[in-house]
C-alpha cells in the first residue's frame, strides 16, 4: 500500500456512521466536525442524532460543501434503534466501513452525593451506547469485506480525573471497552481507537451559557494557551479512521493542548 500521498486518506467512497453528529443551530460539535471532515475526504456519511433536525442540519452543511450524507434519528441507548441505524447505512449506501461514537452526557457528583439513577444513566449513555452501536456495526463492516475502523470518544477525565466521579468512570470504561474490542476484532481487520478530548469549546459545553472568565480558564488549562474546538476532535477522528492510521489500534489519542500535563509551576517547591 502506497501511503506517500498526504491526500490519500483512503476515505473516498467509504461509508461512515457518525453518532451524535448533530449540533445546536450552526454550531460545530465534535460529531458534526467529524462528519463534515469525513465527507470532505470523500466518505458518505450517515449522520445520526436523537433529534432528526440536528442531524439534518449537519447533512445540509455536508451537501452544501459538495458531499454525500443522509440523516437518521436514533436513540443509541436503544438496541432496536442501533440495529435500525446500521440497517439504514447498509440500505442507503450499500456498505459500512467506519463508526464514530460521539454521544455522551456529563455529571458532577461524587460517590457520596451522586444519585444511583444518575450513575446508571451516565453509564448507559456513555458506555452502553457504544457497546450497542458496535454490536451491530461490526458485523456490517465484516460483511462489507474491507475491514473497518471505530473511534470512540472518551475524555481526559478518564486519564487524570478531577472529581466528576461518574463521568470519569464512564469515560475510563470507554477506553477499556475500545481496547477489548480491538483485541476481539483485530483478526477481522477492524481497528478500534479512542480520542480523549480536553476542554474543547463546543455547543454541548456552551448550551447553558459560559462566562468569559470560565471560557478563559478552560483555555488557560492548555499548555499552548489556545482554545480547543470541535474541529480539533474531528481531525483526530478522521486521522484514526483513515489509512494513515492503518497500523494503529487499541490506542487513545489525547487531544487537549497538553492539559493533562499541567501541574505545579516548574519553580514550585
Located regions from the model:
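Short C-terminal tail/terminal secondary-structure segment
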Residues: 2-7, 238, 249-269
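Canonical Rossmann dinucleotide-binding motif of NAD(H)/NADP(H)-dependent dehydrogenases/reductases
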Residues: 10-46
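Residue(s) in the substrate-gating loop at a strand-loop-helix junction
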Residues: 155
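Active-site helix of classical SDR
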Residues: 134, 170, 178
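Substrate-binding pocket helix/loop in short-chain dehydrogenase/reductase
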Residues: 110-111, 115-120, 218
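Alpha-helical segment proximal to the catalytic Tyr-Lys
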Residues: 139, 183-187, 246
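C-terminal helical subdomain
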Residues: 7, 176, 194, 213-248, ...
Amino acid at each position: 500500500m502506497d501511503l506517500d500521498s498526504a491526500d490519500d486518506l483512503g476515505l473516498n467512497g467509504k461509508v461512515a456512521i457518525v453518532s451524535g453528529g448533530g449540533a445546536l443551530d450552526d454550531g460545530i460539535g465534535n460529531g458534526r466536525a467529524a462528519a463534515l471532515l469525513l465527507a470532505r475526504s470523500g466518505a458518505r456519511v450517515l449522520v445520526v442524532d436523537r433529534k432528526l433536525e440536528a442531524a439534518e442540519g449537519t447533512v445540509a452543511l455536508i451537501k452544501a460543501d459538495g458531499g454525500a450524507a443522509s440523516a437518521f434519528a436514533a436513540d443509541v441507548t436503544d438496541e432496536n434503534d442501533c440495529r435500525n441505524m446500521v440497517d439504514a447505512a447498509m440500505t442507503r449506501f450499500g456498505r459500512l466501513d467506519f463508526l464514530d461514537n460521539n454521544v455522551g452526557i456529563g455529571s458532577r457528583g461524587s460517590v457520596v452525593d451522586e444519585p444511583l439513577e444518575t450513575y446508571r444513566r451516565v453509564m448507559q449513555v456513555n458506555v452502553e451506547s457504544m457497546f450497542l452501536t458496535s454490536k451491530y456495526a461490526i458485523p456490517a463492516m465484516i460483511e462489507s469485506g474491507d475491514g473497518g475502523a471505530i473511534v470512540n470518544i472518551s475524555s481526559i477525565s478518564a486519564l487524570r480525573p478531577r472529581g466528576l466521579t461518574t463521568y470519569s468512570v464512564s469515560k475510563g470504561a470507554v477506553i477499556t471497552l475500545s481496547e477489548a474490542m480491538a483485541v476481539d476484532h483485530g483478526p477481522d481487520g477492524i481497528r478500534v481507537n479512542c480520542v480523549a478530548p480536553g476542554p474543547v469549546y463546543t455547543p454541548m459545553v456552551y448550551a447553558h451559557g459560559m462566562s468569559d472568565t470560565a471560557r478563559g480558564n478552560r483555555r488557560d488549562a492548555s499548555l499552548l494557551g489556545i482554545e480547543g474546538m470541535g474541529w480539533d476532535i474531528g481531525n483526530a477522528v478522521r486521522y484514526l479512521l483513515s489509512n494513515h492510521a492503518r497500523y494503529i489500534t487499541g490506542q487513545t489519542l489525547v487531544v487537549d493542548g497538553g492539559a493533562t500535563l499541567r501541574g505545579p509551576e516548574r519553580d514550585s517547591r
